[in-house]
Amino acid sequence: MQTLQVDLGERSYPIHIGERLIDRSDLFASKIRGRQVAIVTNETVAPLYLDRLTSTLSGYSVTPIILPDGESHKNWETLQLIFDALLGARHDRNTTVVALGGGVIGDMAGFAAASYQRGVDFIQVPTTLLSQVDSSVGGKTGINHPLGKNMIGAFYQPRAVVIDTATLATLPSRELSAGLAEVIKYGLICDEPFLTWLEANIDRIRSLDSLALTEAIHRSCAAKAKVVNADERESGVRATLNLGHTFGHAIETHMGYGVWLHGEAVSAGTVMALEMSSQLGWIGQADRDRAIRLLQRAGLPVVPPAEMQPQDFLEHMAVDKKVLDGRLRLVLLRQMGEAVVTGDFPRGVLETTLSADYGAMTEHLGA
């Protein structure tokens, strides 16, 4: 087992990474203060891991809360089901909420924990690659709104993150690829040597090689923790973690939540951010194509939806969380391994980016 630390003073917490950690009662006992535990999971994950985690927590009074699966359920109605269960079982302020699942479960369980009786403890047990390397770390919680993704929520840190890498054995290949979009992101924004390592090891990761997976998760979490330590509430450098997300969130919102997986939309959005960085002269086309090839090798889409027009992107991007005083800001690359958040770009460059022929741009690169 490997352990990293998110250093936030009194709200610091460990990230444990290893195989079969769901069975390690000691990792949970030190972070649970009361006798009541609510395990929030979904219909897909529950048959796989709920009984095991319940057994691990057998010394507590456990309430299972099983939600419908999918991004389309990340809303007020589903959040209310968590509150209904907590109140129905008379959970008090010493309750610990445990999120067992992917990013949707983690975001909603965390938001419920932040809100229930004005805040109870919670622990993240992420079971998808995307949630293990990104959404479980850093305290972002929330739900979607029809007008925008993740627009309602709170910053609320977990007491611990327990990453059981063995859960990836049951993850569909499409979901694994979606998680790789966030892994590749770290190499692009802050760790070019990691990008080089990924180019050499992407096939091992996709074949679930234990050592390669653990290394990728550890390096991703270390990068995320470093950024969160410096900027917990996304007032500065943390926003660089959103490379590709402004374009990607527009895709998710326009196409309908869940039609494109989050990582798939981020991948296509990353290609758009790379193209815009290239248009600005910050990175060369060779660097742009290098990143696109890696995304392709990860099994990810690199072309935005054909049915989306530039105006569709602009309308959705106008409600992005990085918009300040009506000004759109984007995460772009100054160079490989260095990202910047900026609103200082010509409108024409953005329009050229939105209208580019990404099919023609990427088809010659191959997978």
Curated annotation (Swiss-Prot):
Listed under catalytic activity are: 7-phospho-2-dehydro-3-deoxy-D-arabino-heptonate = 3-dehydroquinate + phosphate
* Pathway the protein acts in: Metabolic intermediate biosynthesis; chorismate biosynthesis; chorismate from D-erythrose 4-phosphate and phosphoenolpyruvate: step 2/7
The record lists NAD(+) as bound by: 69-74, 103-107, 127-128, 140, 149, 167-170
Give the main EC class: lyase
Q: GO terms for molecular function, please? A: 3-dehydroquinate synthase activity; metal ion binding; nucleotide binding
Specify the superkingdom: Bacteria
Q: Which UniProt keywords apply?
A: Amino-acid biosynthesis, Aromatic amino acid biosynthesis, Cobalt, Cytoplasm, Lyase, Metal-binding, NAD, Nucleotide-binding, Zinc
Q: What is its EC number?
A: 4.2.3.4
Comment on bound cofactor: Binds 1 divalent metal cation per subunit. Can use either Co(2+) or Zn(2+).
First-listed, main subcellular location of the protein, grouped into a coarse class: cytoplasm
The record's subcellular locations are:
Cytoplasm
Instruction: Report which residue ranges the record marks as coiled coil.
Output: none
Swiss-Prot/TrEMBL GO biological process terms: amino acid biosynthetic process; aromatic amino acid family biosynthetic process; chorismate biosynthetic process
Q: What Pfam families is this protein classified in?
A: DHQ_synthase, DHQS_C
What job does this protein perform? Catalyzes the conversion of 3-deoxy-D-arabino-heptulosonate 7-phosphate (DAHP) to dehydroquinate (DHQ).
What family is reported? Belongs to the sugar phosphate cyclases superfamily. Dehydroquinate synthase family.
Q: What is this protein's name?
A: 3-dehydroquinate synthase
From what organism does this protein derive? Stutzerimonas stutzeri (strain A1501)
The beginning of the lineage is: Bacteria, Pseudomonadati, Pseudomonadota, Gammaproteobacteria, Pseudomonadales
